[in-house]
Structures are given as structure tokens and as C-alpha cells.
Amino acid sequence: MKNLLRSFLLLIFGTITMAEDVDLFEASNRVVFEFNQALDENFFEPIARTYKESIPKTMQNRVSDFSSNLNDIYTLGNEILQFKLFDSVSTFGRILVNSTIGLVGLFDVASDIGLEKTNEDFGQTMAVWGVSSGPYVVLPVLGPSTMRDSTGTYVDITENIDVTKELNTTEEVALLLAQAVDTRVKLLPVTVLLKNSDDVYIATRSSYLQKRQFDIFDGNPPIENDDF
């Protein structure tokens, strides 16, 4: 299977990205960060605020639930790769329920009946496999990441393309934009907190790395820092 082969090749690549300095590329990262900040302040954030204030909450919920159902597909694959069998069965149940009773994912019926949502991506999968995070990096447009997570993001994006390949170009673009806006709306409260920081770059980096620790260890990160 070409996707599995691609994933393992990326895993091999990811193992060479280890570095003791968490922000080895800080100088260049700050340049990209400033670019991303300007792009966000002048484009993404205004769109997100307009969307939140203008679109009925019911409609926003449909977009959010539909995106969440698609995300469950990626989560299921990563849970299997991480040997989280109980979680994978639960996530499969979520997909089944929401894709049928929930009208192709427009309604999150699964959560209402007690099927808890989990989130797993390929970056987390590589962490579970023992791949070091490598240094912190800031990706153009995509934002905070690490060498491991940027590799994981590539896999996640290509898998997203595979899942939506039956859509035409217009439908794919519309779906991508809807998911991007939905994600940005959810980050609006965080934006306010970060902007009040003495150094927004450092605050963003710290917030991202802490959240990734939280995600990788399923909400129970170790007290002492380690290679993750």
C-alpha cells in the first residue's frame, strides 16, 4: 500500500531530525512568524470574526460537526497505527453513527449517545513510535510545528486528499476553506491571550509545545520533560 510505504519512509526521515535545542532555528522562525502574524491579522482573523458574528450558530455547528466527522477518519487510522484498539473501536462507532444517523456528519449524534471524541494525527503516531520531536519550526501559513510534526502534517494533508478525492476541485476548495475558517474561529479566544503576552512568539511556542505534550500523552503528560 503506497500510503503506508510513504508513512514509513517519512518515519525514517523523521528520525534524523533530532536536536537538543528546542528552537534551533529561532531567527528564521521569527521571520516566518511575523509573516504569518501579518497574514492572519489582515486576512484570516477578520474572516473568522465575520463568520462568527454573521453566520447563525446552527449553521456554524453543522460545519464544525462535518469537519469533526472527517477528522474522525484520520483519527481512526492513527489509533490503529498506535495500537489503541479500544479507542479505534469507539472512533469507528462515531463515524458509523454520525455518517448515517447524523446525516453524513452534519450532526454529532455519537457524542450525544456517549461515544467520546478523540483526536490523533500522524505526528502523535510518530511520537508514540519513539520518533524525537526535533527542533521547533514555524511553517509558512500553517504556523507552529516541530520537525516531527511537520512530517506528520505532510502525511495528514496527503491522506486528506485521498479521502476527498471523489470531490471536484470546487468542492475540495470549499471544504478546505470551511475547515480552515472553523479551525480559526475556535482559536479566537487563544489569540486574545497570546496578544497580551510580552513576547507573542515565545508565548505561541510554549503554548504549542505544551499542547502537543498534552495530546501525545492523552491528557496525562509526564512531569519531567523527555524526548517527546
What is the predicted role of each segment?
Residues D21-F35:
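Short N-terminal segments immediately surrounding and downstream of signal-peptide cleavage
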Residues E20-D23, Q124, W129-F228:
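A structured, mid-to-C-terminal "fold-capping" secondary-structure block
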Residues G14-T17:
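N-terminal signal peptide c-region/cleavage motif recognized by signal peptidases
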Residues N69, L76, Q82-P144:
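Mid-length scaffold segments of soluble, non-membrane domains
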Residues E20-D21, Q37-A48, N71:
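Short alpha-helical hairpin
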Residues K2-L10:
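Sec-dependent signal peptide recognition
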Residues N42-M59, I161:
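Membrane interface segments of multi-pass transport proteins and intramembrane proteases
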Residues Q60, S64-F66:
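Beta-rich strand-turn-strand
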